[in-house]
Amino acid sequence: MKHLISLLAFSFLIGCDAEKSNKTKPPEAISVSPNLKYEIKGDAVAITRCDKKASGELIIPANIEGKPVTEIGTFAFSSCYGLTSITIPDSVTSIGDDAFARCASLTSITIPDSVTSIESTFSLCVSLTSITIPDSVTSIGEMTFLGCNSLKNITIGNSVTSIGDYAFLRCTSLTSITIPDSVTSIDKQAFKGCNSLTALTFLGDAPEIANDAFEQSSPTIYREPDAKGWGDTLAGRPVKLITEKP
């Protein structure tokens, strides 16, 4: 069952219910953008779409019709070019593929620590400058930040174990990243075209990594002195001790 949330329509329905029976208390109004579509899934709610004309700041409600919002669906906010800031409630546990892809004006978004995985979620968000991936997330899927060419600062949570194909492809403003010791694999072209990237600091053992992970990028790799599995290079890039970091 899909709905279009509309404050005007919602107020109208309340008025109609009140006219039918003055004994029935109207439902409490939902403070939410009028442009969201959602779907009831059992005891929970999934946000399925946002009007592409939406602009400025948007707050996703934690509850709709008395049920928690737990999911942001695939392509839900894709190509909402006018949105600059989105607040996601802590009730959300799942964010679908491409959920915020091509939100070209988006500069600020917080991933709640209830989410466990992201994939192609923010691709081509060309105005996004910084983001924190919470400790609840265990994987950064393929193309998650592809083409986010304004992204300068990223904090990767301590539970991430894998970085997928093209995850940071052409993030041309990134200069340095710290990789937590939880990361065990980095897939193909994960950092391709990150031509400003000069330093990757690894806090754990050497991960399994695709040979082309740093294609068209020239970072120096820094590692902990007591970490295992390291050689003089990683995917063709020089490896040094953290103590040698400038």
Where in this protein do the model-derived segments appear?
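Short, aromatic/basic amphipathic alpha-helical patches
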Residues: 212-213, 228-240
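Bacterial Sec signal peptide processing site at the extreme N-terminus
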Residues: 18-27
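Residues that act as N-cap/strand-start positions at coil-to-secondary-structure junctions
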Residues: 30-32
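Positively charged n-region of N-terminal signal peptides that target proteins for export
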Residues: 1-5
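C-terminal motif of bacterial Sec signal peptides marking the signal peptidase cleavage site
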Residues: 14-15
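Short secondary-structure subsegments characteristic of cysteine-rich extracellular domains
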Residues: 10, 77-80
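Structural signature of tandem-repeat unit edges
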Residues: 35-45, 53-71, 81-94, 104-117, ...
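Consensus positions within tandem repeat domains that build extended binding/scaffold surfaces
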Residues: 74-76, 96-99, 119-121, 141-144, ...
